[in-house]
Regions:
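Polysaccharide-binding surfaces and accessory modules of carbohydrate-active proteins
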Residues: 1-202
Length: 202
């Protein structure tokens, strides 16, 4: 199992890719080509954003930067949402990473629940407006995951009456794939869940 993926990051001249001010003239450093934990719009990362806020002046750039972290000796819970909870057999741990957006004062907290015995990591996110003006939240995902390129496949489930959850399998390519239901709820037509696996995994 890989523990440190930094050796897989290929740094080369990324001409015409956006560079943050801190990179100076280093054209090998671009938010558009490096793995991101929180991709956001307006800062040189052109992938789909995880968080999109609109400020009172109409701007939607959001530059979330690491601020602090905390390790809790219990699992986290999100009110009204399903979750894994501490039991007598296993007590989870939680890593909370706090990121701040300097211009707006918005704080993004990332929660990582770890259940080591079950080999499970859960993720949630919470946005807090600590600024002096209102913001409009246009988009908020609980997580975004950049994976280094390998031969992955996506398994998802479509169906119809009396033939629910028919497994479909497609290779991951340079394309956008959306999994979801347009009925307003999950159903026998579509189950909004995905399995990401290595090519040919059974």
């Amino acid at each position: 199992m890989r523990k440190n993926l930094s050796g897989l990051i290929f740094c080369t001249d990324m001409g015409f890719a956006g560079n943050p001010e801190e990179a100076g003239s280093d054209r090998t450093y671009s938010l558009d080509t490096l793995p991101q934990e929180v991709p956001s719009s307006g800062v040189g990362d052109y992938r789909d954003d995880m968080v999109r806020i609109r400020q009172v002046d109409g701007s939607c750039a959001a530059d979330f930067r690491f601020d602090s972290y905390e390790i809790l000796d219990h699992s986290y819970a999100v009110p009204g949402m399903p979750a894994l909870y501490d039991t007598e057999e296993e007590k989870g741990e939680t890593l909370v990473i706090t990121m701040k957006e300097k211009a707006s004062g918005v704080v993004l907290k990332l929660f990582y629940g770890v259940f080591e015995n079950e080999n499970v990591i859960t993720r949630a996110a919470r946005l807090e407006n600590h600024g002096e003006t209102a913001i409009e939240l246009e988009k908020m995902l609980s997580f975004s995951m950049d994976l280094m390129y390998e031969n992955y496949e996506v398994i998802y489930f479509s169906g119809r009456h009396a033939m629910e959850r028919t497994a479909e399998r497609i290779p991951v390519q340079h394309a956008k794939v959306e999994i979801g239901s347009t009925r307003g709820t999950s159903s026998h037509h579509y189950n909004p869940a995905v399995i990401l696996c290595e090519e040919g995994a059974g």
